[in-house]
Amino acid sequence: MSAQSVVPRFTVITLGVAEMRRSIAFYASLGFARKFQATGEAVAFFDTGGTVLALYPWDALAHDAGVPDAPRPQAFRGVTLAWNCRSEAEVDAALASAVEKGTNLLKSGQQTDYGGYSGYFADRTVTSGRW
């Protein structure tokens, strides 16, 4: 297979998480359907409507990638995941729902410079510590 025949696309986004049970419960509570129950808590896969979200223990993911497990930073790591909604009201409702489920609201819904409407919440199950 040549490099030209490889179709560029993301099929799985994997998050290294500090607490698998808590992370699995959190993403299920947001309404994402879990795929492949046979894996138990070793890894969790969620259907996100095209791309799969995978949760994997932080240290195991570092080991699998062949990189040292560094201390978990408490600052922004340069990655966000977008959840597109149909309206501003739906964005606000999604943010409120996430906060009710234990996340920290980082930025309430507001107009963006690029013509959208967005907000941010921090998934505390991905990292240990305070946001």
Role assignments for model-derived ranges:
Residues 48-50, 74-78:
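Short connector loops at helix/strand junctions that flank enzyme active sites
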Residues 26, 89-95:
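Short amphipathic alpha-helices within nucleic acid-binding modules
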Residues 11, 41-42, 79, 105, ...:
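Residue-level marker for the onset of beta-strands and adjacent loop->beta junctions
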